[in-house]
Amino acid sequence: MSIGSPRRSLAAAVAALPATFFIGASRAQSASESTLDRVTRTKQLRLAAVSGSPPYFKKDIATGQWSGAAIEMAKGIASVWGADLIFVETTYGNSVLDLQSNKIDIAFPLNPTPERALAIGFTKPFIVMPYGCLARPGFAPQSWADLNRPELRIAFDLGSLHETCARRFAPRAQLTGYESIQQCVLALQSGHADAEIIAAVIGLGMVGQNPSLGPYRLLGTPTVALPGCYGIQREPDTRFRDVVDAWIDFNRGIGTIREMMINGLALQGVTPDQVPASLTF
Protein backbone atom coordinates (compact mmCIF):
# COMPACT_ATOMS: atom_id res chain seq x y z
CA MET A 1 0.00 0.00 0.00
CA SER A 2 1.38 3.38 -0.92
CA ILE A 3 1.88 6.18 1.57
CA GLY A 4 -0.64 8.34 -0.31
CA SER A 5 -3.54 5.91 0.06
CA PRO A 6 -4.49 6.74 3.67
CA ARG A 7 -4.35 10.42 2.81
CA ARG A 8 -6.60 9.89 -0.18
CA SER A 9 -8.97 7.87 2.01
CA LEU A 10 -9.05 10.65 4.59
CA ALA A 11 -9.64 13.26 1.88
CA ALA A 12 -12.46 11.17 0.47
CA ALA A 13 -14.01 10.80 3.89
CA VAL A 14 -13.84 14.54 4.50
CA ALA A 15 -15.29 15.26 1.07
CA ALA A 16 -18.20 12.96 1.87
CA LEU A 17 -19.20 14.99 4.91
CA PRO A 18 -22.34 17.08 4.33
CA ALA A 19 -21.93 20.82 3.89
CA THR A 20 -24.09 21.36 6.95
CA PHE A 21 -21.30 19.85 9.06
CA PHE A 22 -18.99 22.73 8.21
CA ILE A 23 -21.72 25.32 8.51
CA GLY A 24 -22.63 23.99 11.93
CA ALA A 25 -19.00 23.94 13.02
CA SER A 26 -18.49 27.50 11.82
CA ARG A 27 -21.55 28.70 13.68
CA ALA A 28 -20.51 26.86 16.82
CA GLN A 29 -17.08 28.49 16.69
CA SER A 30 -18.48 31.99 16.11
CA ALA A 31 -21.05 31.46 18.85
CA SER A 32 -18.41 30.46 21.40
CA GLU A 33 -17.89 34.10 22.36
CA SER A 34 -20.87 36.28 23.16
CA THR A 35 -21.23 39.83 21.88
CA LEU A 36 -20.66 41.26 25.33
CA ASP A 37 -17.53 39.17 25.86
CA ARG A 38 -16.15 40.09 22.44
CA VAL A 39 -16.76 43.83 22.89
CA THR A 40 -15.26 43.67 26.37
CA ARG A 41 -12.18 41.85 25.07
CA THR A 42 -11.54 43.85 21.88
CA LYS A 43 -12.80 47.25 23.06
CA GLN A 44 -14.51 47.59 19.67
CA LEU A 45 -18.20 47.96 18.81
CA ARG A 46 -19.01 47.20 15.17
CA LEU A 47 -21.82 49.38 13.79
CA ALA A 48 -23.76 48.95 10.55
CA ALA A 49 -23.16 52.31 8.83
CA VAL A 50 -25.53 53.28 6.01
CA SER A 51 -24.31 56.28 4.02
CA GLY A 52 -26.79 58.82 2.71
CA SER A 53 -29.40 58.06 5.36
CA PRO A 54 -29.86 61.17 7.49
CA PRO A 55 -30.88 61.92 10.17
CA TYR A 56 -29.27 58.66 11.28
CA PHE A 57 -26.18 58.55 9.06
CA LYS A 58 -24.27 61.12 7.04
CA LYS A 59 -20.77 60.56 5.64
CA ASP A 60 -18.56 63.43 4.52
CA ILE A 61 -17.14 62.24 1.20
CA ALA A 62 -14.17 64.58 1.45
CA THR A 63 -13.07 63.62 4.96
CA GLY A 64 -14.67 60.21 5.46
CA GLN A 65 -16.11 61.42 8.77
CA TRP A 66 -19.49 60.11 9.92
CA SER A 67 -22.19 62.13 11.67
CA GLY A 68 -25.86 61.72 12.50
CA ALA A 69 -28.14 60.49 15.25
CA ALA A 70 -27.18 56.83 14.90
CA ILE A 71 -23.50 57.69 15.14
CA GLU A 72 -24.01 59.64 18.37
CA MET A 73 -26.14 56.90 19.90
CA ALA A 74 -23.60 54.22 18.94
CA LYS A 75 -20.79 56.29 20.45
CA GLY A 76 -22.76 56.53 23.67
CA ILE A 77 -23.27 52.77 23.78
CA ALA A 78 -19.60 52.10 22.96
CA SER A 79 -18.54 54.38 25.81
CA VAL A 80 -20.11 51.97 28.30
CA TRP A 81 -17.23 49.61 27.53
CA GLY A 82 -14.68 52.32 26.77
CA ALA A 83 -14.75 50.86 23.25
CA ASP A 84 -13.94 52.34 19.86
CA LEU A 85 -16.68 52.52 17.24
CA ILE A 86 -15.94 50.52 14.08
CA PHE A 87 -17.94 51.52 10.99
CA VAL A 88 -18.97 48.65 8.70
CA GLU A 89 -20.58 50.13 5.60
CA THR A 90 -23.68 48.26 4.51
CA THR A 91 -27.36 48.80 3.64
CA TYR A 92 -30.48 48.50 5.76
CA GLY A 93 -31.43 45.35 3.87
CA ASN A 94 -28.02 43.72 4.31
CA SER A 95 -27.65 44.67 7.97
CA VAL A 96 -29.79 41.70 9.02
CA LEU A 97 -27.48 39.34 7.12
CA ASP A 98 -24.45 41.11 8.59
CA LEU A 99 -25.75 40.45 12.09
CA GLN A 100 -26.36 36.80 11.27
CA SER A 101 -22.84 36.38 9.86
CA ASN A 102 -21.17 38.14 12.83
CA LYS A 103 -19.87 41.04 10.74
CA ILE A 104 -21.46 43.62 13.03
CA ASP A 105 -22.65 43.89 16.61
CA ILE A 106 -25.47 46.42 16.26
CA ALA A 107 -27.62 47.97 13.52
CA PHE A 108 -30.28 50.67 13.63
CA PRO A 109 -32.85 51.88 13.09
CA LEU A 110 -34.73 48.66 12.37
CA ASN A 111 -38.43 47.96 12.77
CA PRO A 112 -38.96 44.68 14.66
CA THR A 113 -41.14 42.80 12.19
CA PRO A 114 -42.02 39.17 13.03
CA GLU A 115 -40.00 37.98 10.02
CA ARG A 116 -36.89 39.84 11.14
CA ALA A 117 -37.35 38.58 14.68
CA LEU A 118 -36.92 35.04 13.36
CA ALA A 119 -33.39 35.95 12.28
CA ILE A 120 -32.01 38.55 14.71
CA GLY A 121 -32.63 40.01 18.14
CA PHE A 122 -34.01 43.43 18.98
CA THR A 123 -33.55 45.87 21.82
CA LYS A 124 -36.25 48.00 23.38
CA PRO A 125 -37.53 50.80 21.10
CA PHE A 126 -35.57 54.03 21.11
CA ILE A 127 -38.19 55.83 19.03
CA VAL A 128 -41.88 55.45 18.20
CA MET A 129 -42.36 56.79 14.70
CA PRO A 130 -45.72 57.79 13.19
CA TYR A 131 -46.44 57.48 9.49
CA GLY A 132 -47.94 59.95 7.08
CA CYS A 133 -47.34 61.32 3.62
CA LEU A 134 -46.09 64.00 1.30
CA ALA A 135 -48.81 65.26 -1.02
CA ARG A 136 -49.09 67.23 -4.24
CA PRO A 137 -49.89 70.97 -4.00
CA GLY A 138 -53.57 71.57 -3.29
CA PHE A 139 -54.11 68.18 -1.67
CA ALA A 140 -54.12 68.20 2.14
CA PRO A 141 -55.02 64.73 3.49
CA GLN A 142 -55.52 64.41 7.24
CA SER A 143 -56.52 60.76 7.60
CA TRP A 144 -55.85 57.46 5.86
CA ALA A 145 -59.44 57.58 4.62
CA ASP A 146 -58.53 60.70 2.65
CA LEU A 147 -56.04 58.56 0.68
CA ASN A 148 -58.29 55.53 0.31
CA ARG A 149 -60.07 56.75 -2.82
CA PRO A 150 -59.93 55.10 -6.26
CA GLU A 151 -59.07 58.31 -8.12
CA LEU A 152 -55.91 58.91 -6.06
CA ARG A 153 -52.43 57.68 -7.05
CA ILE A 154 -50.31 56.62 -4.08
CA ALA A 155 -46.57 55.97 -4.28
CA PHE A 156 -44.36 53.92 -1.95
CA ASP A 157 -40.98 52.20 -2.06
CA LEU A 158 -41.27 48.46 -2.60
CA GLY A 159 -40.69 46.04 0.24
CA SER A 160 -40.89 48.72 2.91
CA LEU A 161 -43.27 49.41 5.77
CA HIS A 162 -44.47 52.31 3.62
CA GLU A 163 -45.85 49.67 1.24
CA THR A 164 -47.41 47.78 4.14
CA CYS A 165 -49.21 50.93 5.31
CA ALA A 166 -50.39 51.81 1.81
CA ARG A 167 -51.85 48.37 1.13
CA ARG A 168 -53.48 48.11 4.54
CA PHE A 169 -54.99 51.58 4.85
CA ALA A 170 -55.48 52.74 1.24
CA PRO A 171 -56.35 49.56 -0.71
CA ARG A 172 -58.89 51.34 -2.93
CA ALA A 173 -56.37 53.86 -4.25
CA GLN A 174 -54.16 53.36 -7.30
CA LEU A 175 -51.05 51.95 -5.62
CA THR A 176 -47.68 52.11 -7.37
CA GLY A 177 -44.45 50.76 -5.93
CA TYR A 178 -41.04 52.16 -6.84
CA GLU A 179 -37.55 50.83 -6.25
CA SER A 180 -36.48 53.71 -4.03
CA ILE A 181 -37.78 56.64 -2.01
CA GLN A 182 -36.07 58.97 -4.46
CA GLN A 183 -38.14 57.53 -7.31
CA CYS A 184 -41.30 58.09 -5.28
CA VAL A 185 -40.33 61.74 -4.84
CA LEU A 186 -39.78 62.10 -8.58
CA ALA A 187 -43.23 60.60 -9.23
CA LEU A 188 -44.76 63.13 -6.85
CA GLN A 189 -42.86 66.07 -8.33
CA SER A 190 -43.64 65.08 -11.92
CA GLY A 191 -47.37 64.73 -11.27
CA HIS A 192 -47.45 60.93 -11.55
CA ALA A 193 -48.51 60.53 -7.91
CA ASP A 194 -50.85 62.43 -5.62
CA ALA A 195 -49.17 61.34 -2.40
CA GLU A 196 -46.19 59.36 -1.14
CA ILE A 197 -46.46 57.28 2.02
CA ILE A 198 -43.45 57.90 4.24
CA ALA A 199 -42.37 57.71 7.88
CA ALA A 200 -42.21 60.94 9.84
CA VAL A 201 -38.45 61.12 10.40
CA ILE A 202 -37.68 60.50 6.73
CA GLY A 203 -40.45 62.79 5.48
CA LEU A 204 -39.42 65.64 7.75
CA GLY A 205 -35.84 65.34 6.55
CA MET A 206 -36.90 65.44 2.91
CA VAL A 207 -38.92 68.60 3.49
CA GLY A 208 -35.99 70.11 5.38
CA GLN A 209 -33.76 69.56 2.36
CA ASN A 210 -36.41 70.57 -0.18
CA PRO A 211 -39.18 72.75 1.34
CA SER A 212 -41.18 72.62 -1.89
CA LEU A 213 -42.11 69.03 -1.02
CA GLY A 214 -43.82 70.11 2.20
CA PRO A 215 -45.45 70.22 4.47
CA TYR A 216 -45.10 66.71 5.82
CA ARG A 217 -48.56 65.46 6.81
CA LEU A 218 -49.19 63.07 9.68
CA LEU A 219 -52.22 60.87 9.02
CA GLY A 220 -54.72 59.86 11.67
CA THR A 221 -57.83 57.70 12.13
CA PRO A 222 -56.06 55.49 12.90
CA THR A 223 -52.69 56.81 13.99
CA VAL A 224 -50.08 54.43 12.62
CA ALA A 225 -46.89 54.42 14.69
CA LEU A 226 -44.22 51.74 14.78
CA PRO A 227 -41.25 51.26 17.10
CA GLY A 228 -37.68 51.70 15.93
CA CYS A 229 -35.15 49.44 17.65
CA TYR A 230 -31.51 48.45 17.48
CA GLY A 231 -30.93 45.13 15.76
CA ILE A 232 -28.49 42.81 17.51
CA GLN A 233 -27.25 39.25 17.11
CA ARG A 234 -29.59 36.53 18.31
CA GLU A 235 -27.74 34.62 21.01
CA PRO A 236 -28.53 32.82 24.28
CA ASP A 237 -26.40 35.26 26.29
CA THR A 238 -28.64 38.31 26.79
CA ARG A 239 -26.16 40.48 28.71
CA PHE A 240 -25.30 42.71 25.73
CA ARG A 241 -28.98 43.37 25.04
CA ASP A 242 -29.59 44.02 28.73
CA VAL A 243 -26.86 46.68 28.80
CA VAL A 244 -28.12 48.37 25.62
CA ASP A 245 -31.72 48.28 26.89
CA ALA A 246 -30.57 50.00 30.08
CA TRP A 247 -28.72 52.62 28.00
CA ILE A 248 -31.90 53.28 25.97
CA ASP A 249 -34.14 53.60 29.04
CA PHE A 250 -31.72 55.93 30.79
CA ASN A 251 -31.03 58.17 27.80
CA ARG A 252 -34.67 58.39 26.74
CA GLY A 253 -35.53 59.31 30.29
CA ILE A 254 -33.08 62.22 30.51
CA GLY A 255 -33.80 63.44 26.95
CA THR A 256 -30.43 62.54 25.40
CA ILE A 257 -31.89 60.44 22.59
CA ARG A 258 -34.35 63.21 21.69
CA GLU A 259 -31.47 65.69 21.57
CA MET A 260 -29.47 63.36 19.31
CA MET A 261 -32.44 62.91 16.97
CA ILE A 262 -33.13 66.66 16.81
CA ASN A 263 -29.45 67.29 16.01
CA GLY A 264 -29.58 64.62 13.31
CA LEU A 265 -32.66 66.21 11.74
CA ALA A 266 -30.89 69.58 11.85
CA LEU A 267 -28.35 68.13 9.39
CA GLN A 268 -31.23 68.25 6.89
CA GLY A 269 -32.44 71.70 7.86
CA VAL A 270 -35.30 70.56 10.12
CA THR A 271 -36.02 72.86 13.08
CA PRO A 272 -37.37 71.61 16.45
CA ASP A 273 -40.73 73.32 15.91
CA GLN A 274 -41.27 71.21 12.77
CA VAL A 275 -41.09 67.95 14.72
CA PRO A 276 -44.61 66.69 15.53
CA ALA A 277 -45.46 66.00 19.16
CA SER A 278 -46.52 62.43 18.32
CA LEU A 279 -42.95 61.63 17.24
CA THR A 280 -41.59 60.38 20.56
CA PHE A 281 -37.95 59.64 21.34
Give residue ranges: language-model regions.
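Ligand-binding clefts/hinges and TM-proximal coupling segments of bilobed small-molecule sensing domains
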Residues: 30, 161-178, 215-218, 248-281
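N-terminal export signals
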Residues: 2-3, 9-28
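Extracytoplasmic small-molecule ligand-binding "clamshell" domains
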Residues: 31-110, 118
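A ligand-binding cleft/hinge motif common to bilobed small-molecule-binding domains
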Residues: 94-97, 110-119, 165-168, 189, ...
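Short loop->beta-strand "edge-of-pocket" segments that line small-molecule binding or catalytic clefts
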Residues: 42-51, 145-161, 174, 249
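Periplasmic-binding protein-like
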Residues: 51, 128-138, 200, 208-248, ...
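A conserved helix-loop-strand patch within extracytoplasmic ligand-binding domains
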Residues: 83, 87, 91-93, 111-116, ...
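Extended ligand-binding regions for polar small-molecule ligands
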Residues: 68-80, 139, 145, 151-153, ...
